[in-house]
Amino acid sequence: MRTLWIVAVCLIGVEGNLFQFARMINGKLGAFSVWNYISYGCYCGWGGQGTPKDATDRCCFVHDCCYGGVKGCNPKLAIYSYSFQRGNIVCGRNNGCLRTICECDRVAANCFHQNKNTYNKEYKFLSSSKCRQRSEQC
């Protein structure tokens, strides 16, 4: 029974919002593009601190701030509806916090696309020692 519970929790994480966000990024930038943003700069990936290194990193900072303002559900697990229409991400008929989460993810995916020319490979797997400046306010 415990094994079944662990599998269920893992599947929720895979089917949840972070997976949807990854699909949005890949849809805007191409297959497997999400891997470029998993550990980039000071804000792309788990946590975040310091000053964003470039426009790409700022996309992640804004996304973190957006998630920080979500009330009523967990932005990393909640499942919302969305679609791609003529290359544009369109959030579906979501209510309340699901709508907010979808918009956070849509804006970030579009931001990555709009700022893809600022992506700097030197910021991939950036040491946290490079992000020790005082964090900006959302």
From Swiss-Prot:
Expressed by the venom gland. GO terms for cellular component: extracellular region. Pfam families: Phospholip_A2_1. Its main location: secreted. Heterodimer of a weakly toxic basic protein having phospholipase A2 activity (RV-4) and a non-toxic acidic protein which inhibits its enzymatic activity but potentiates its lethal potency and neurotoxicity (RV-7). Ca(2+) binds at residues 43, 45, 47, 64. One of its GO terms (biological process) is arachidonate secretion. The lineage of its organism: Eukaryota, Metazoa, Chordata, Craniata, Vertebrata. It catalyses: a 1,2-diacyl-sn-glycero-3-phosphocholine + H2O = a 1-acyl-sn-glycero-3-phosphocholine + a fatty acid + H(+). It comes from Daboia siamensis (Eastern Russel's viper). This is Basic phospholipase A2 RV-4. It comes from the Eukaryota.
